[in-house]
Amino acid sequence: MIGGEEDVVRHLDPLFKTIAPGVDGAPRTPTRSGSGTTAEDGYLHCGPAGAGHFVKMVHNGIEYGIMAAYAEGLNVLHRANVGKADQEVDAETAPLQDPEYYQYDLDVPEIAELWRRGSVVASWLLDLTAAALAESPDLEGFGGRVSDSGEGRWTIRAAIDEGVPVPVLSASLYERFTSRGEAMYADRLLSAMRKQFGGHAEKVAAGS
């Protein structure tokens, strides 16, 4: 993802070609025809100065969304045995309507391994996810605090400037804020409001 003046980029092309992954980095897209482009070699002159950084910024914003989708989907699988737990009916949580449908003790690491082998959601990120789950199925050692390095924010700002809706990318960034406790005040305020209008006492979390 390169930005710069045409003649400068052309002069540096041998360098870019040398460090790029090359055509063997991935099979050729079946619907492409004609001679190959530099994109098929793994590099591309995207436009004037700044264009390469802009493309990389959006690439990383998309990465946030993909990572969030994997995490959320695998969490649904992880919780698929919730019907086996004793269900408490109270004002805090609506009862599980059909607990018999949620009796699955699923092997999430094995499912991730399965999906990375020819599934429509296969990707390098899923390869890494499967590796992480193989190393630590319960993800011990991870507290769930997720940093953001800036590209997600910049992508969303660009989308706002362009008038382009990016709800998935926005939600994935906000989830990272939540993971760091940035929603704690709002959550406490919600709990306080429930107590004010309905007298709902906050339930103490198990193990607290």
Where are these regions (language model features)?
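Short beta-strand-to-turn element immediately C-terminal to the catalytic PLP-Schiff-base lysine
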Residues: 1-5
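NAD(P)-dependent Rossmann-like dehydrogenase/reductase catalytic/cofactor-binding core
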Residues: 10, 17, 23-56, 67-208
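Gly/Ser/Thr-rich loops at beta-strand to alpha-helix junctions
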Residues: 63
